[in-house]
Amino acid sequence: MEKVLVFGHKNPDTDAICSAIAYAELKKELGMNAEPVRLGEISGETQFALDSFKVEGPRFVETVANEVDNVILVDHNERQQSANDIESVRVLEVIDHHRIANFETSDPIYYRCEPVGCTATILNKMYKENGVTIRKEVAGLMLSAIISDSLLFKSPTCTEQDVAAARELAEIAGVDADSYGLEMLKAGADLSGKTMEQLISLDAKEFQMGNAKVEIAQVNAVDTNDVLVHQAELEKVITTVVEEKGLDLFLFVVTDILTNDSVGLAIGKATNVVEKAYNVTLQNNTATLKGVVSRKKQIVPVLTETFQA
């Protein structure tokens, strides 16, 4: 039987990795030869989840057409966030919870996108719909994905469905969602030993906003100053990325997991859009973004609307 690769976006977060593993397992149970893979490095937060439930991380690939003809996308749909040669393979399915942009296929596909906080929440439903029992280890990874995407249920993207799914999965996994979740987020917020290049690419996504090319990277921290003490070095590597990719804006968002506020560091010719979008004045290229924790709900749509205005 021909193999199908299942993967999340480049610079994968916990949902991208864990949902790839969980969905590949479901597809295997349903008779498909599916393998989860990843398009980038595994973060400290995700590694904590994998170690906690004793699951091996998926192997890394840069291209997919050299291995398979068919793929399944989880936690993304936009071409620029996917495998480098995504145009050379057939996308069989997409399971996602983001905006739909820069995506089209030549054949009809199974496309499931729901306005929930996490792909794993959708997968929890799909396991039930197919009558497949979720293994303890996989339930733990799916729980980890929901905790990560919802910032332990504090993000405005978090829905009642996400919370309910997390409670169900925690029971299967045999952990307390809140205490485990805090440990996992703290592991993800430990940025010691990371280079500046790693910091700005740990969780970075590229977007087309009107005519503008924008990259938004986000890291979680227990104290934003722990990251911003390196601002001069960060600006240097961000400027290099802006020049290499021809970006109009690079927004580096440092989110405090305790206060649920963020600080944005903006570089590029379109930094004025950040000021306009959030009614702030950038001082030394930074501004506090009160109550902003979600790239998907509080940054991407706000900036897109401002760019298109």
Curated annotation (Swiss-Prot):
Name of the protein in question: Probable manganese-dependent inorganic pyrophosphatase
SMART domains: DHHA2
Entry superkingdom: Bacteria
Cited NCBIfam families: PRK05427.1
GO cellular component: cytoplasm
Cellular compartment(s): Cytoplasm
Catalytic activity: diphosphate + H2O = 2 phosphate + H(+)
Record Pfam families: DHH (PF01368), DHHA2 (PF02833)
